[in-house]
Structure formats: structure tokens, C-alpha cells
From Swiss-Prot:
Region feature Non-LT domain, mapped onto this chain: 22-268
Ranges in a coiled coil: none
E.C. no: 4.2.2.n1
Catalytic residue positions: E313
Name by which UniProt lists this protein: Membrane-bound lytic murein transglycosylase F
Source organism (scientific name): Yersinia pseudotuberculosis serotype IB (strain PB1/+)
Single GO BP term: peptidoglycan catabolic process
CDD domains: MLTF-like, PBP2_YfhD_N
Domain notes: The N-terminal domain does not have lytic activity and probably modulates enzymatic activity. The C-terminal domain is the catalytic active domain.
């Protein structure tokens, strides 16, 4: 998975030109009520989607996801309320569109020519490749000719179109089946669990799921990069499309689209099986000893984020000591510990409390111009590198015409702090900026793993409890001296 190759300037220019070209076809100019008028009259933008960590998910009733946030911003742009309509599979999405039960589909859908008979597409907002996956430990196929097992893909997915084309053009013996009951995410999970031989997925979703299911392995790329886009109803009315183009153009111009892409996709590129497997094992075997302390002292920080910071620092080893003298779960220096009132750096609770306080102080110290949802990454860079060096990275960003308040811009300048071409001109001099870059990226990856892994455990526990409850109804416990029918 990589970012769209086109420059954001090009996207914005194309959006503007298309909007101008569509101007004559906007219905309100002819006295008709168009799609956009209907949405505004209703006061709601109905968006159909599919549950997935990347697309749309909820934790404690708080929604998140790339498509969700983008749709929420579009609804705000239109001045209406966002109504999310989750569906289980892609066929249901397009049926809802056909039946006028939704206004647009925002579900990480790959651009597909076959779908153009049923729907229109909006602008692309990121790109992915289609990949064939298998379970690690099984023989790795190098092409479709090497497959020795069953291939199943989600019904209605772009993967079906791809497989049909490959069968017609290159692999006449290729066979597969489609599943109506299982979503693409569920099929990927089945491969990871050894319940299915192969399936196809998009590179972004696979990269995220590997953080939770490290046994999920990529055999090969099936396609080149393809755009991901929204879909909406076919119509001669261009009002909604024109509004969408204006919205995307604005998102590109102010950098919001790049920041959103960074938030959900900027840290998922590299995958280390051993590191991920080791971390998931530590969640089961080590984290329970300290979880209550992370929850107790997290304050305004998500306890899970505080926990993964500690893992990045010490691998949850309270006795950890570095060659430079930092110690404990949160790897505090003596000077920092003294300033926080931490008397014993290897005491787990003192270390966690001190680290949480220090991080919150850094967040409050940051310039107010930094967006709320990006402040934590700047604070973590300062936690690792030092506040002054983080400010140097912001200055470098501004001097190079980047946005010093955007993490996606600043993180790319962190490695420059160790390069002779740049650090002599900084206020605080040389710093291992590349280490701070990796530090923050690792924490973000661990956070994806921890949040997703705990959600999976909760889901399985709930399913197990439901099964137990059902079995209890079927086989009621009979006390001594009682019989069924008494």
C-alpha cells in the first residue's frame, strides 16, 4: 500500500476544472431538486459502510475510521447530520444505493469499471493493491498456478472482477468461490486462523490486520496500485458530485486529506512478524500485571496508548536500564524523575505515574496551533528527543515551506536533525531525529495491535458467553432430588 502517486496540487486542479465543467448540469439552475437539495432538505447525509478498523469502527460508542472521518467532514461541509448505515457485505451496499436507502457508499471500495453500470465514483483518496494471502507456515504460492487449496473472496468485491479477468486472460484453470455470509475482513481472519487456504484483500487492510493476526502472510501482489473511492447513485444530476469535488479540493488545499491519510495509513508500511508476535504474547502474559496501573494514572491519555509507550521504552520490564542511565518501565532519566517526584524509578507505579505526568506536561506545553488529535505525536517526539529538538524539527519544516503544525510534515524532517547539512543551523544542534521518527511510528503500530487484539479478545469472550448461555438454556442444571417435570 502506498499513497496516491498524483500530487495533491494536481488533484485539486482537476477537481476545480471538473466542478466548472459540471456547472451547466447542476439541477437547481433549471429549477429541479437535485441530489444535494434532497440531502439538505432532509438534513442528513446517509452513508453506507462496512465495519473494519480502517473504514469504520466503534470503541465505547466512539466512532473512528478513515472513511468515517472523511464522511463526517463532508457532512459538516454540507451543513447536515451524518447518518452511518453499517452493512455486512458489499452486495448490500450497492443494493441500498439502488433502492435509494443511502446517499453514498464510503467503505474503502476499490475503483471498478463493472460498478460504473450501477453507480458513479467520487475522487480517489488513497490507493491500494490487491494481494493474495495465505497462512504463514503453509507453502507460499508465487503465482495462481501454485495454488493448492480453496480461494474464497467476498461476494460483490472488486476481487471477483479481478479473478474473472485473470481466468479469461492468463489462468484458465483458476477457480474460486464467493461468500455472501463472510466479509472481506472475516475471510482474511479465517486465513490467519487456518480455516481457509487463500483469499484476496487490499494492501491497507491486510497491513492493519497483520498487527493483530501476524500469521496472515502476503503471497504476492495481484494488481498494481488502484484508487479507492466513494460511490453514489447514477444520475444526470451533478449537484452532489460537484459538491464532493469542491470538498475534496478544499481538503487537499488545506492539507486535511494528507493529515487524515497519515493518521490511518502513515505508520502501517513495515511489518515485523517476530516483533508483532512477541508483543501480542506480552499482552497476554505481562500486561495484566500492570494494566491497572496504566488505567489508574493515564489521566487524559488513553491507558492503552500509555501502555504501548511503556512497551516501546522497556518492553514492560520494570528493571530495564539503558547504557545512558535511564531506568524503569517508562525509562526516566534521573533529572526527569527528580522533577516529577519519582523516588524509585524501578518501582512500576512510580514510573508509570511519572511518565504519564511528564507526557501530559509536554502536551500542554505544545503550541496551541497544533491540532488536538496530532498533539500526542509531537509530545512523544519531544519525550524521546527533547522538547527543544522537536521545536527545531518544526522550524526546519516551516523553513522548507511545510506545515509545522502537521505531524505528516514534521516527522519527515526529524531525520534531518542528524544530518550535517541541517543541524548546524538549528537552535539545539545535533539530535538522533531518525530514532525519534522510528520511536513514534513503533508506538503507533503497537497501539494498532493492542487496541485490535483486545477488541478481538472481547469479541471472542462475548461469543463464548453467548454459546454458554444458549447451552445453559438447552441443558438446564437440575439440583439434587429434582427431576425435569417436577
Amino acid at each position: 500500500m502506498t499513497r496516491i502517486k498524483l500530487s495533491y496540487f494536481t488533484i485539486g486542479l482537476v477537481a476545480l476544472l471538473l466542478a466548472l465543467a459540471l456547472w451547466p448540469n447542476i439541477p437547481w439552475r433549471n429549477g429541479q431538486e437535485g441530489q444535494l437539495d434532497q440531502i439538505k432538505a432532509r438534513g442528513e447525509l446517509r452513508v453506507s459502510t462496512i465495519s473494519s478498523p480502517l473504514i469504520y469502527s466503534t470503541e465505547k460508542d466512539t466512532p473512528s475510521g478513515f472513511d468515517y472521518e472523511l464522511a463526517k467532514r463532508f457532512a459538516d461541509y454540507l451543513g447536515v447530520k451524518l447518518v452511518i448505515i453499517p452493512h455486512h457485505n458489499i452486495d448490500d451496499l450497492f443494493d441500498a444505493l439502488d433502492n435509494d436507502d443511502t446517499d453514498l457508499l464510503a467503505a474503502g471500495l476499490i475503483y471498478n469499471r463493472e460498478r460504473l453500470n450501477r453507480a458513479r465514483t467520487g475522487p480517489a483518496y488513497y490507493s491500494v493493491s490487491q494481494q493474495l494471502v495465505y497462512r504463514l507456515g503453509s507453502p507460499r504460492p508465487k503465482s495462481f498456478s501454485d495454488l493448492k487449496g480453496q480461494v474464497v473472496v467476498a461476494s460483490g468485491s472488486a476481487h471477483m472482477t479481478t479473478l474473472k479477468r485473470l481466468k479469461q486472460t492468463k489462468y484458465p484453470e483458476l477457480n474460486w468461490s464467493s461468500s455472501v455470509d463472510k466479509s472481506g475482513k472475516e475471510l482474511l481472519e479465517q486465513v490467519a486462523e487456518g480455516k481457509l487456504d487463500y483469499t484476496l484483500g487490499d494492501s491497507a487492510t491486510i497491513a492493519l490486520l497483520q498487527r493483530i493476526h501476524p500469521q496472515l502472510a502476503v503471497a504476492f501482489d495481484v494488481t498494481d496500485e488502484e484508487p479507492v473511492t466513494w460511490y453514489f447513485k447514477q444520475s444526470d444530476d451533478d449537484s452532489l458530485y460537484a459538491a464532493m469535488l469542491d470538498f475534496y479540493s478544499e481538503m487537499v488545499e488545506d492539507g486535511s486529506l494528507a493529515r487524515l491519510e497519515e493518521k490511518y495509513l502513515g505508520h502501517v508500511g513495515s511489518f515485523d512478524y517476530v516483533d508483532t508476535k512477541t508483543f501480542l504474547s506480552a499482552i497476554d502474559n505481562v500486561l495484566p500485571s500492570y494494566q491497572h496501573l496504566f488505567e489508574k494514572h493515564a489521566g487524559d491519555i488513553d491507558w492503552k496508548l500509555l501502555a504501548v509507550i511503556a512497551y516501546q521504552e522497556s518492553h514492560w520490564n520494570p528493571q530495564a536500564t539503558s547504557p545512558t542511565g535511564v531506568r524503569g518501565l517508562m525509562m526516566l532519566t534521573r533529572v526527569t524523575a527528580d522533577g516529577l517526584g519519582v523516588k524509585d524509578r524501578v518501582d512500576p507505579e512510580e514510573s508509570i505515574r511519572g511518565g504519564a505526568i511528564y507526557l501530559q506536561r509536554l502536551m500542554k506545553k505544545l503550541p496551541e496551533t497544533i491540532p488536538e488529535d496530532e498533539r500526542i505525536w509531537f509530545a512523544l517526539a519531544a519525550y524521546n528527543l527533547g522538547y527543544g529538538h522537536m521545536l527545531d524539527a518544526r522550524r526546519l519544516t516551516k523553513n522548507q515551506n511545510g506545515n509545522p503544525d502537521s505531524w505528516v510534515d514534521v516527522k519527515m524532517r526529524l531525520p534531518m536533525l542528524s544530518q550535517k547539512r541541517y543541524y548546524p543551523s538549528t537552535t539545539y544542534g545535533y539530535a538522533r531525529g531518525h530514532e525519534a521518527y522510528n520511536y513514534v511510528e513503533n508506538i503507533r503500530r503497537y497501539q494498532v495491535s493492542l487496541v485490535g487484539y483486545l477488541q478481538e479478545k472481547e469479541k471472542k469472550a462475548a461469543q463464548h458467553a453467548a454459546i454458554e448461555a444458549e447451552l445453559g438454556k438447552s441443558n438446564p442444571v437440575v439440583g439434587p432430588g429434582w427431576s425435569i417435570g417436577d
